[in-house]
From Swiss-Prot:
This is ATP synthase peripheral stalk subunit OSCP, mitochondrial. HAMAP family: ATP_synth_delta_bact. Subunit OSCP, of the mitochondrial membrane ATP synthase complex (F(1)F(0) ATP synthase or Complex V) that produces ATP from ADP in the presence of a proton gradient across the membrane which is generated by electron transport complexes of the respiratory chain. ATP synthase complex consist of a soluble F(1) head domain - the catalytic core - and a membrane F(1) domain - the membrane proton channel. These two domains are linked by a central stalk rotating inside the F(1) region and a stationary peripheral stalk. Acetylation of Lys-70 and Lys-158 is observed in liver mitochondria from fasted mice but not from fed mice. It comes from Mus musculus (Mouse). Belongs to the ATPase delta chain family.
Amino acid sequence: MAAPAASGLSRQVRSFSTSVVRPFAKLVRPPVQVYGIEGRYATALYSAASKEKKLDQVEKELLRVGQLLKDPKVSLAVLNPYIKRTVKVKSLNDITKREKFSPLTANLMNLLAENGRLGNTQGIISAFSTIMSVHRGEVPCTVTTASPLDDAVLSELKTVLKSFLSPNQILKLEIKTDPSIMGGMIVRIGEKYVDMSAKSKIQKLSKAMREML
């Protein structure tokens, strides 16, 4: 059963890609590869929006779609599995007209409704946001500390982290607090991961001592 299902998903994505990119002969590759059915839709949308120079507009519209789907009334109207697809398509048409979405965003939502894939919408939005973040040269960085950092330490940390970036890259920093690491910090920047927490050091010490016995 898995193979036919996968084949069906591929046809849906090709259908979307063809419908939104039809005026153009060649797809624009995204700056980062995103996976799964959500990634395929997001990639096709990025290509079409890039060709039409509407990347920023589509990104804003998708964020608005995400907000709308969190509204209980909208969610009930378009995500309820017991509501007919034709009814969902009409509801979405009304929404896209009211919000004055671009044809790119409207076509995506209509196709998802017709193919019963509205449940993938948030994943597609997330995948598109990931592509756009890399497109802008943003480098995600998460720093976890046992207690909040004061302004002076935070400023110094930002300076150090930015020194690892190239001139055209932008640091996208998120600070988290987790008392369980006991002290120090854990840094994840891009695909790099450095654990300098006290908890990690204690665990390494404990392991080394056990190996000595």
